């Protein structure tokens, strides 16, 4: 069972986001102990960077273990059919017992859609190609029962943020904090989303949040279409 699935995003004027991804998992069965003995997280090195900030295990017997995040493994993510060069970070927790609680935080910076080609090697590659604009698609479904799921994003005061929640409902709010607009979206008691034979992708059927700092939804699509036209992506011959 997931007790908390929380993401906090701080958006810079360039559109780059700094993400704090926190998760608290309670092991209830031997099967759950096996499933959670290793933590994995996927990211695209062309557009983002991710690392474990902390991992704490609260044992059922009262013992508290702080894991060494320097033992993190970073490797090419498993793929098939199409190989995008995605990577995965992994940290082994080791043996768990029912009643143990795993609490970890992952720090990520970057954005969530692909570049046309390889970017620079410095932090400028984490700035979205549509410079100054922030965009995200947040899945609000879960593979395990989740007590609370929260997505919180802070944007500069001068930026506007439009959003739409699809295939469900969530609680939302906007507040002014530390010279930023802070938007919070939350759902309680999220149950695993059932799948059916030959159904569409979960992004087209399960609850999700979409947001963009562009004045209109279509602006991002029009911008990318124009860039790809100029790049020659739609040319009939290479």
Positions of PLM-derived features:
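Early extracytoplasmic/domain-onset interaction patches
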Residues: 1-41
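Residues within well-ordered beta-strands of beta-sheet-rich folds
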Residues: 22-24, 101-107, 152-154
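Surface-exposed beta-strand/loop patches in extracellular or lumenal glycoproteins
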Residues: 24-53, 129-158
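Carboxylate/His-rich catalytic cores and anion/metal-binding grooves
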Residues: 32-64, 206, 210-225, 230
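Solvent-exposed beta-strand/loop surfaces of large extracellular or lumenal domains
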Residues: 46-89, 113-137, 164-185
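Exposed beta-sheet edge/beta-hairpin loop segments within beta-rich domains
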Residues: 90-95
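Secretory-pathway-linked proteins and extracytosolic
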Residues: 109-120, 129-133, 140-238
């Amino acid at each position: 069972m997931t007790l908390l699935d929380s993401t906090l995003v701080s958006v810079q004027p360039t559109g780059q986001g700094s993400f704090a991804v926190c998760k608290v998992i309670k092991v209830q069965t031997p099967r759950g102990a096996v499933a959670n003995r290793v933590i994995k997280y996927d990211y695209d090195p062309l557009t983002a960077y991710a690392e474990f900030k902390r991992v704490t295990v609260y044992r059922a017997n009262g013992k508290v273990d702080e894991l060494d995040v320097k033992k993190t493994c970073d490797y090419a993510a498993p793929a098939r059919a199409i190989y995008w060069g995605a990577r995965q970070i992994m940290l082994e927790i080791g043996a768990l017992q029912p009643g143990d609680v795993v609490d970890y935080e992952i720090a990520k910076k970057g954005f969530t859609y692909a570049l046309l080609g390889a970017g620079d090697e410095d932090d400028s590659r984490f700035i979205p190609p549509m410079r100054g604009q922030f965009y995200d698609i947040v899945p609000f479904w879960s593979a395990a029962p989740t007590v609370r799921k929260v997505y919180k994003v802070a944007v500069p005061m001068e930026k506007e943020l439009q959003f739409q929640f699809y295939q469900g409902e969530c609680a939302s709010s906007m507040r002014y904090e530390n010279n930023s607009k802070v938007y919070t979206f939350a759902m309680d008691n999220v149950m695993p989303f059932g799948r059916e034979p030959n159904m569409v992708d979960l992004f087209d059927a399960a609850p999700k949040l979409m947001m963009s700092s562009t004045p209109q939804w279509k602006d991002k699509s029009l911008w990318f279409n124009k860039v790809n036209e100029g790049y020659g992506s739609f040319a009939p011959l290479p």
